[in-house]
Amino acid sequence: MAVISGSDSVLLSNGSISTSTSNPSPLSPSDGDLPAQHLGPRETPRTKASPNGCLQLNGTVKSSFLPLDNQRTPQTPTQCCHPCPYHHPVSSHSNHQECHPEAGLAASPALASCRMQPHSEYSASLCPNHSPVYQAAHCLQPSPSFCLHHPWPDHFQHQPVRQHLTIIRPSRPFKFPRSYAALLADWPVVVLGMCTLLIVVCALVGVLVPELPDFSDPLLGFEPRGTTIGQRLVTWNNMMRNTGYKATLANYPYKYAEEQARSHRDDRWSDDHHERERREVDWNFQKDSFFCDVPSDGYSRVVFASAGGETLWNLPAIKSMCDVDNSRIRSHPQFSDLCQRTTAVSCCPSWTLGNYIAILNNRSSCQKIVERDVSHTLKLLRTCAKHYQNGTLGPDCWDKAARRKDQLKCTNVPRKCTKYNAVYQILHYLVDKDFMTPKTADYAVPALKYSMLFSPTEKGESMMNIYLDNFENWNSSDGITTVTGIEFGIKHSLFQDYLLMDTVYPAIAIAIVLLIMCVYTKSMFITLMTMFAIISSLIVSYFLYRVVFNFEFFPFMNLTALIILVGIGADDAFVLCDVWNYTKFDKPRAETSEAVSVTLQHAALSMFVTSFTTAAAFYANYVSNITAIRCFGVYAGTAILVNYVLMVTWLPAVIVLHERYLLNIFTCFRKPQPQAYDKSCWAVLCQKCRRVLFAVSEASRIFFEKVLPCIVIKFRYLWLIWFLALTVGGAYIVCVNPKMKLPSLELSEFQVFRSSHPFERYDAEFKKLFMFERVHHGEELHMPITVIWGVSPEDSGDPLNPKSKGELTLDSTFNIASPASQAWILHFCQKLRNQTFFHQTEQQDFTSCFIETFKQWMENQDCDEPALYPCCSHCSFPYKQEVFELCIKKAIMELDRSTGYHLNNKTPGPRFDINDTIRAVVLEFQSTFLFTLAYEKMQQFYKEVDSWISHELSSAPEGLSRGWFVSNLEFYDLQDSLSDGTLIAMGLSVAVAFSVMLLTTWNIIISLYAIVSIAGTIFVTVGSLVLLGWELNVLESVTISVAVGLSVDFAVHYGVAYRLAPDPDREGKVIFSLSRMGSAIAMAALTTFVAGAMMMPSTVLAYTQLGTFMMLVMCVSWAFATFFFQCLCRCLGPQGTCGQIPFPTKLQCSPFSHTLSARPGDRGPSKTHAASAYSVDARGQKSQLEHEFYELQPLASHSCTSSEKTTYEEPHTCSEFFNGQAKNLRMPVPAAYSSELTKSPSSEPGSALLQSCLEQDTVCHFSLNPRCNCRDAYTHLQYGLPEIHCQQMGDSLCHKCASTAGGFVQIQSSVAPLKASHQAAEGLLHPAQHMLPPGMQNSRPRNFFLHSVQHFQAQENLGRTSTHSTDERLPRTAELSPPPSDSRSTESFQRACCHPENNQRRLCKSRDPGDTEGSGGTKSKVSGLPNQTDKEEKQVEPSLLQTDETVNSEHLNHNESNFTFSHLPGEAGCRSCPNSPQSCRSIMRSKCGTEDCQTPNLEANVPAVPTHSDLSGESLLIKTL
């Protein structure tokens, strides 16, 4: 309720008015005009406008920035955002020379959002002499406003006619922005224009200058570079590429060879021999055969399985496979152009089971076979299977020319098993390897699970249209059989198309995130511009990546950065918008530049922490040896940092522009306007939308501010045990069993589509099930041992460009021709053949160790022929150098001519340069190790062979000491690089996260807890991926290393909030961090989760894996940060300076300066000047200390409760003290006490209390620093006659706290007193600024307050005061009753009965105005006696913590004015205590751990009002959120 000047009329929040007659106040204005001093133009004070309800130049009092849910007000307010009709003409001045306290009369809280914005050159003044007209600016909140300059009764009874208002727009000379925030506030369009220009230039340069990326080869870059094996493999490949005719190296001595023969310029020495040979189809046009050729790897093929899980060896299934072949492949219009032909009109038949059964049973086609043919063929296969299995039945047992069995081969094989080679081809190509095993010999019908179909078309790009037209959208089944695997040779080509087509899923994710962001911010403009900033981040980072960093390779994985950036960018936008709205709520009348400065100071730090940790996790991938991973890490990390830069330049300018011009562009989000009831569908829809949003807002507020803290704290031990168990289980899965498996597919079979795709199933499953694939892909092939001399194993290419492999670097010390080298290398070959890992081949080996072959050739030459000398047997080994150099050339040419064995670039032996000088030597042997994809076996092979060769080379002569060994180790090197690189990247990410956390909080304990939480997140996430069947491949390595960057964000936010919490105890800090950051973190997790979920339908594996990972890591990270980390802090969290790193004050981050700056020794009286710096300077000059703390307030002190011990920094004007209207009252404590001391004798109780306050050494409730001690801070505060101005108040209070930033009381509110609340329309005032911003979803603003109004009469009418010590957890409220002798109303006044305690701790108590005092604390009870003067001492309950002290008036003299409390609509769960204490019992309480959680009473007639229990006698100090 509010007070009317001249009478004690009380307006309750439910609309009723309670009045009581009183003596008129001596300060009541006679005409309702503003008294002002008449000053000269040069004497006009040019002070900074007070942002929180200060007196303005035109006599108005800035109304607060408040959305209210005043649904009980019966009338509709007048329209907001118009020129104020109650302004006086510009020329009207008052002759009064004093600044009376009635200078500004507050507007109704329901009308408090009509923001009057002065130009910057007009400054606020306490006693202005002019009234410059303010422009009626747009409304900032969804509640209309009035601009009132008359006393309330006169105004509402006699509303004047709208006067003509002259709008004066003073010229604004150009002034260079004082700061970056001023630049954003004054020139947002310029900032946006510059950013747009930069983005456009980067886009044009990035697209036009370098070549566009090519994704045709998705496997490009998936190879290690820079490792020992990698360098050797690159050098070996360079050797093969540079070996040939007229190349750097050659197998033949060409100068010598040209003298012998000039026919060696064959294609076998061409440059393209270094590429991987690909077997081409050797078309065989034999018309006398049913089939045109033998099926081979070069043909397109399809794998069938039974649709019902039965065997395929039955007549319907066999015919079904033929039907699918005819309907899906052979019927395609392009098939006739692609197929192999025997005649001009017909294509060759496909190799299917049906056609083989037909040829064996003399049927014309597959459709003609019968059941008997199937049985006969099965019997034949059973008879011949053993010959195939023991190797006697081969592919050449049938003589096609003679059309009979080859008489010279397969002598032990029955003739029927060799007919047409059908049995061999069926068992080798068409059926799986388990069909005719000895285990199935006794089965009546062996189970044929899979069957292959070969089509007479070459696989490759030509099959693309057939697949897209007939297979892509087909359900792959005809009811009998199902196509489970396809190999058309178009996997990588199709991947490039799918990579572009599946970008629709990231687009859907972006759209949904946009929708969430739009609902959250209620601004389509901010949403679209945020998304534009995210897309621009990718564009600018692409420019930096390609042009500035000069990266030539752009892997396809870089496209997935968009998905990660959408989630991070949305999170940053939420943080910035939240802090902006916190600032606007806390400083509703702050200049735009100041609001931007405060917002950036806190939001920029928060966004930087999250962006830097995630970017660091990406950049940590640069330590990997795999090219694609390194490039992706650089690009993604750069994109996140660029996004951060745009979020602190682009987005603030967007918000300023939106706040200034575009606030009402969308009608549904527009503030309610007073208009006739609109029954249109759009109006009804908007109204319902607002109601739904409000309901969701309230539900989320209740959950995050009440339910979630209650759940976390009450079950904290259960949560700790549960999440520790999960961590241990995840660590066991990751490290012990089953462990994260390394890749099981070769690089050529690298998975690019989802696992269910038929292309991927063929590579992953069916290649292992058919014998021709097992033999072709190296199963059971021996690993080669290749030893090389003469070339240095150096990779001189660009490791960031997979196409740059460098050039050969020859070893200048190499010398094989010396006798010592000849003898050593021969001995080396002999020793190697004696090793256990050497495999002896049956065939004669001419090339393995060339020195052995050369020595044997020399010994076989007859020296009788003069032409052979000296290359003959007369020479003994080792040979002279000149003999060796000459004879080696003859031996090579003779070997080529006599044996017909042609040497190629892979053949071991000597390598010659263009001068026929031996520059390199290659030896190659077969090992007993078989090729496998198992990492352990390959590691054993490499370690064993490499260690033996290294040991032997240590004794080699100088010319052979630099040899090295290589083999087919590409896949093993990839596995090794992935396993090591992933662990290193994760460790580096954790180290960076710990460093950032430490630098952010300056607390070791919190940082360690955060790292423990991150470790648990990593173990559980990776363990879950292991159980999902993930293998540690390239994509998986990237995603897992990024898990650190994505999971650290939540712990950092909670940790910072824990440090910022003003509560001294752990529980209060945990509740503060949960209520402050809970909803913001949940929204961040939700947006990232949604972005990941939208990836799941994608065909591209990179999208689906990233989506799976993002969903999993968001859920696990949120759970660990919310329950595990917070429970750790609740049980073992630091208190006070525990774990705090001492750091110089000047170098601290500003959010912690208030907690780090004060020391116990800084509380002396010599520091009191710092406290007075917060008072209003008549010259408008604020100290630097005030300015620094002013910007700390929105994050550090959004609420002020009895347990927070936090003050607010913004001073108030005298008029706000004396007129009884508090809009944003912030009163310097020393000033208040100084005023009290000047008027009260030292013998009065108030003075005694004051002296005791200065003597005691306990916590000061007015200090931001919880270590600052000043007990009994709330004492007898009284404001005297209007002549006492703010600057006249002393600064003698609480000298022990004066040095800190917290020497002031702020009676803060975003609400003006109810002047015309009965005019507010029910249902039109929307309470929710956002849908879910933390702490602002409630039906009141965060800094809601109740103020008291008192009419001062005389200084000597002072009531006695006493000190009450109230419990921090169970706050009390007092009920003030006037004496019965009072000639005015004897009605008891009502006091708010709820103390929010950070919106968490609530208890309703009814108290008597009589105070009880005791040494240990006091406890009040309701008393029905109106004239109680005696003080009783009550003992506080043992479980209660005594931290807050309040000074309450014991009695009010009947000559003194009465107190009235303006009960405004407030938070659910709080209501005014009526006269009877029994009424408070309607408010239910439930015990939540150690907290008292209050349940709202929905049946309250008077809206609930949150107040603070710290109440002073004649000047009620009420602190709330």
Curated annotation (Swiss-Prot):
<dbReference type="GO" id="GO:0009953">
    <property type="term" value="P:dorsal/ventral pattern formation"/>
</dbReference>
<keyword id="KW-0217">Developmental protein</keyword>
<dbReference type="GO" id="GO:0007368">
    <property type="term" value="P:determination of left/right symmetry"/>
</dbReference>
<dbReference type="GO" id="GO:0060539">
    <property type="term" value="P:diaphragm development"/>
</dbReference>
<dbReference type="Pfam" id="PF03176">
    <property type="entry name" value="MMPL"/>
</dbReference>
<feature type="transmembrane region" description="Helical">
    <location>
        <begin position="1109"/>
        <end position="1129"/>
    </location>
</feature>
<feature type="glycosylation site" description="N-linked (GlcNAc...) asparagine">
    <location>
        <position position="390"/>
    </location>
</feature>
<keyword id="KW-0325">Glycoprotein</keyword>
<feature type="domain" description="SSD">
    <location>
        <begin position="485"/>
        <end position="657"/>
    </location>
</feature>
<feature type="region of interest" description="Disordered">
    <location>
        <begin position="1"/>
        <end position="55"/>
    </location>
</feature>
<comment type="function">
    <text>Functions in hedgehog (Hh) signaling. Regulates the release and extracellular accumulation of cholesterol-modified hedgehog proteins and is hence required for effective production of the Hh signal. Synergizes with SCUBE2 to cause an increase in SHH secretion.</text>
</comment>
<dbReference type="GO" id="GO:0140104">
    <property type="term" value="F:molecular carrier activity"/>
</dbReference>
<protein>
    <recommendedName>
        <fullName>Protein dispatched homolog 1</fullName>
    </recommendedName>
</protein>
<feature type="transmembrane region" description="Helical">
    <location>
        <begin position="1038"/>
        <end position="1058"/>
    </location>
</feature>
<comment type="subunit">
    <text>Interacts with SHH; via the cholesterol anchor of the dually lipid-modified SHH (ShhNp).</text>
</comment>
<keyword id="KW-0812">Transmembrane</keyword>
<feature type="transmembrane region" description="Helical">
    <location>
        <begin position="1008"/>
        <end position="1028"/>
    </location>
</feature>
<feature type="region of interest" description="Disordered">
    <location>
        <begin position="1355"/>
        <end position="1440"/>
    </location>
</feature>
<feature type="compositionally biased region" description="Polar residues">
    <location>
        <begin position="1"/>
        <end position="10"/>
    </location>
</feature>
<comment type="similarity">
    <text>Belongs to the dispatched family.</text>
</comment>
<feature type="transmembrane region" description="Helical">
    <location>
        <begin position="499"/>
        <end position="519"/>
    </location>
</feature>
<feature type="glycosylation site" description="N-linked (GlcNAc...) asparagine">
    <location>
        <position position="14"/>
    </location>
</feature>
<feature type="transmembrane region" description="Helical">
    <location>
        <begin position="524"/>
        <end position="544"/>
    </location>
</feature>
<feature type="transmembrane region" description="Helical">
    <location>
        <begin position="637"/>
        <end position="657"/>
    </location>
</feature>
<keyword id="KW-1133">Transmembrane helix</keyword>
<feature type="compositionally biased region" description="Polar residues">
    <location>
        <begin position="1418"/>
        <end position="1428"/>
    </location>
</feature>
<feature type="glycosylation site" description="N-linked (GlcNAc...) asparagine">
    <location>
        <position position="581"/>
    </location>
</feature>
<dbReference type="InterPro" id="IPR052081">
    <property type="entry name" value="Dispatched_Hh_regulator"/>
</dbReference>
<keyword id="KW-0472">Membrane</keyword>
<feature type="transmembrane region" description="Helical">
    <location>
        <begin position="189"/>
        <end position="209"/>
    </location>
</feature>
<feature type="compositionally biased region" description="Low complexity">
    <location>
        <begin position="11"/>
        <end position="35"/>
    </location>
</feature>
<dbReference type="GO" id="GO:0007225">
    <property type="term" value="P:patched ligand maturation"/>
</dbReference>
<feature type="compositionally biased region" description="Polar residues">
    <location>
        <begin position="1355"/>
        <end position="1364"/>
    </location>
</feature>
<feature type="transmembrane region" description="Helical">
    <location>
        <begin position="986"/>
        <end position="1006"/>
    </location>
</feature>
<dbReference type="GO" id="GO:0015833">
    <property type="term" value="P:peptide transport"/>
</dbReference>
<feature type="transmembrane region" description="Helical">
    <location>
        <begin position="548"/>
        <end position="568"/>
    </location>
</feature>
<feature type="transmembrane region" description="Helical">
    <location>
        <begin position="603"/>
        <end position="623"/>
    </location>
</feature>
<dbReference type="GO" id="GO:0016020">
    <property type="term" value="C:membrane"/>
</dbReference>
<feature type="glycosylation site" description="N-linked (GlcNAc...) asparagine">
    <location>
        <position position="1455"/>
    </location>
</feature>
<dbReference type="InterPro" id="IPR004869">
    <property type="entry name" value="MMPL_dom"/>
</dbReference>
<dbReference type="InterPro" id="IPR000731">
    <property type="entry name" value="SSD"/>
</dbReference>
<feature type="glycosylation site" description="N-linked (GlcNAc...) asparagine">
    <location>
        <position position="58"/>
    </location>
</feature>
